[in-house]
Amino acid sequence: MKLRENARFSTICIHAGQVPDPSTGAIITPIYQTSTYVQDALGVHKGYEYARTQNPTRSALEANIAAIERGKAGFAFASGMAAEGAVMTLLKSGDHVVVTDNTYGGTYRLFEHVLRKYGLDFTYADTSRLDEIERAIRPNTKMLFLETPTNPVLRLTDLTGACEIAHRHDVYVVVDNTFASPFVQRPIDFGADLVVHSTTKFLNGHSDSVGGVVVAVRDDHIEWLRFVQNAEGAILGPMDAWLVLRGTKTLPIRMERHNANAMALAEYLASHPRVPRVLYPGLTSHPQHELARRQMCGFGGLISFHAGSLERARTVLNGVRLMALAESLGGVETLISHPATMTHASVPIERREQIGITDDLVRISVGIEDIDDLKDDLSQALDR
């Protein structure tokens, strides 16, 4: 079970970080549900002392996702927001961050309502336009925080171009890769310094775990994140780590189906007379379709569309039978949501409208069900 250096993506997902249990030979990493570890003698231990600091199940997951994202080290946290919070401790009071303007509502809440109190400054820019990134950078800018595709309007950032601009100004780049998943894109390949995920989503893939991860490439970032993970203690528990490890093994085959179903459903919606506009990078009508073709392997499992009015959106959301009305994304089941009142409710209405999150916008996290069943469900909801 030795993983070769040139192993391909699916093989890495299954085997990276995985070692048969030395005492039993169990092929699957055990759930080490313990808070502490017995030492052989004073100062003599097997590499584990206290579970906040180290846990073998968590360590296996961290190695697995670091390899999947082509980073040097990974750090697993209790949620995606805990992972983002850890990354932000790389900054100090007075530092400035340029952020994708259409970022996740929870990220906006953390930055605006928590971190501003500690002296960090944020500028929200349309990072789909490289000139906007250049204009937003100041002498005290330390970080470029990107989300691509964005949630929920699926706007893309040219990662190669953005990283070149940032590094020219000695600014490091953080990419939230939750929406795409590493199957679709690996930001480190394009120059990113740090990648964050909510493992709750595609990495876990089964809607039964909440967690987050940071993948780093720079030694100074790795050293600091290891310290902060232990100091703050917002760690991922062993059961959740095991669930995500189970999920990453099937990530490639799940993402193939997510991508295929989303493409088919987007094309169906685009042809429906009661749908004014569909947002999906795989459609040639998407303004950044060519960038998506260059930067992404597939176009992801998320679709957004305009229903025409809040009432029409409500009719569709309440009318589906197979799809579940719920927040989150990336599970095997299809979820449908209303960003303006759900995932982005914490974003002020004027800002939501500015970035395209209108009251008629509906988001679908496309699952891996039979595509004809998904079309049938949407059809009966749209025809109401």
What are the language-model segments listed below?
Residues 2-5, 15, 73-274, 279:
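Conserved PLP-enzyme active-site core in the AAT-like
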Residues 2-55, 61-64:
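N-terminal "arm"/small-domain region of PLP-dependent enzymes with the aminotransferase-like
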Residues 10-27, 311-351:
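C-terminal core of ALDH-fold dehydrogenases
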Residues 36-85, 89-90, 106-113:
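Conserved N-terminal alpha-helix of the aminotransferase class I/II PLP-enzyme fold
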Residues 36-38, 216-220, 248, 307-311:
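Short loop segments at secondary-structure junctions
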Residues 121, 135, 139, 254, ...:
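PLP-dependent enzyme catalytic core of the Aspartate aminotransferase-like
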Residues 244-253, 300-308, 363-367:
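Short, well-ordered beta-strand elements within core beta-sheets of diverse protein domains
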Residues 263-327, 347-353, 379:
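Conserved small-domain helix->loop->beta segment predominantly found in fold-type I
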